[in-house]
Each structure stands twice: as C-alpha cells, then as structure tokens.
Regions:
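Bacterial N-terminal signal peptides that target proteins for export
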Residues: 1-6
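N-terminal signal peptide c-region/cleavage motif recognized by signal peptidases
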Residues: 14-16
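Extracellular secreted precursors and ectodomains with disulfide-bonded cysteine-rich loops/domains
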Residues: 19-21, 77, 125
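Short boundary/loop segments of OB/S1/cold-shock single-stranded nucleic-acid-binding domains
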Residues: 20-36
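Structural detector for short beta-strands of small beta-barrel domains
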Residues: 35-57
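Intrinsic-disorder/low-complexity, polar/charged segments enriched in Ser/Thr/Lys/Arg/Asp/Glu/Gln
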Residues: 37-39, 68, 91
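OB-fold (S1/OB) nucleic-acid-binding surfaces
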Residues: 50-73
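Netrin-like (NTR/C345C) domain of secreted extracellular proteins
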Residues: 79-206
Length: 206
C-alpha cells in the first residue's frame, strides 16, 4: 500500500516537473531588452488561450507595421509568464522575441488557442525583466539593478520617455537607476517648477 502511494507521488512530481519551466535569470530590463526583436509600449486588447492581442501604442525599438500584434505566453513548459498576469486594458512595456519558425509539438489541433505560437507573432520570456507595468507615461518593474525574479520591486516610477531614450542609446543605465531612486515628492516639485518656468507640458506624476 505504502509502496503504491509512493509510486503515485513520484509520478505526480514527475508530471508537474515536466510542465515547469527551467531557466536562469538573464537580467533586468536594461540588460535583456537589447537582445530582443521588438521593444514597445502597448495595451492589452483581448486574451485568448495562452495569447494576448496587444495594441502598438508606441515603438521603442524595432519595426512593426501592424497596429495590433499577438503575443504568446505560458503553455506547457515554455518559459513565459502566465496569461492571467496581463488583463484586458492593462498597459505594458514589453521586450519581445519574434517567432521565426515552428517547433515540434508546438501546435495541437485539439487546443488551437493554446500553442507555442505562430510564425510572425511574438513571445514574451519569463527569464528576466522582459516586461514593465505602465500607468500612463510612467513605468515600474524589474527595470534596472532590481532583485532577481522580483516583478514589482520597490522603486520610483520612471517616465517612459527616459526608458525610450535608454533603449535607443541616448542615455546610459545610470540615468535609469537615478530616476528609479528619486524621491517622488522632490521629483514632482522639480517637474512642476520646470513646467512653470518653461511653459512646457510635463507628464503628470503618478
């Protein structure tokens, strides 16, 4: 009896293990974004199976001619985040890999909405800081020098324009780090003062 229970337990553990992703942490957003095909800011329009349709609100790097792209997420043992993390209408900055070829077993006709993904679509890795949460013009997440595997580290929101400048090589990592550690009240005062003196429209602090 005990031997039978032990065998069942071992089989269950093996089954779970086969469905788990195994990968090393590849780095925060500032470290991993350069190795991806496309970096953009977008809004989730719909979710279907293990994919989301994302509106292309702003391209930070790369080329994409469609207004809406499909991003494939967790299924089987693929090292990707769970679709439930990205509800409809939520806003994100994502560093994405283009799916360039089919993989064996990547498509099951019995579950067409759950698959590896289609050639020409994109996938989002969970092995680093490949996505940042966006609220208006401000982003948070594993952006720069954040603890491994922590998706919502304690930080000051960083303006999207600065992240865009970093992705395009106009500022260095130090600028991101400084912005993520600024005192929010002091920064808001500086923004208000700058807007008053120059008459420019500055993004409202979150």
């Amino acid at each position: 009896m005990q031997r039978g229970l032990l065998c069942c337990a071992l089989l269950l553990v093996a089954a779970v293990a086969r469905g788990e992703c195994e990968c090393l942490w590849q780095g925060d957003f500032s470290e991993v974004q350069a190795s991806t095909s496309l970096v953009l800011s977008g809004t989730v329009l719909r979710r279907k199976g293990n994919s989301i349709d994302l509106s292309v609100d702003r391209l930070l790097r790369g080329q994409e001619h469609l207004d809406t792209i499909r991003v494939w997420l967790k299924a089987a043992d693929y090292c990707r985040p769970e679709p439930e993390l990205f509800p409809v209408d939520s806003q994100w900055v994502m560093a994405l890999h283009e799916i360039e070829k089919d993989v064996p077993g990547g498509f099951n006709p019995h579950t067409p909405n759950v698959s590896y993904g289609r050639v020409g679509d994109y996938s989002l890795s969970s092995c680093g800081g490949y996505w940042l949460k966006r609220s208006g013009e401000w982003v948070t997440g594993n952006l720069v020098q954040a603890p491994r595997w922590v998706r919502e580290p304690k930080m000051t929101p960083v303006v999207l324009d600065l992240v865009t400048d970093y992705v395009n090589g106009k500022v260095d990592k130090g600028a991101l780090l400084q912005a993520s550690r600024e005192d929010p009240a002091l920064r808001e005062l500086m923004l208000d003062t700058r807007a008053f003196l120059r008459g420019d429209e500055e993004p409202a602090s979150p």
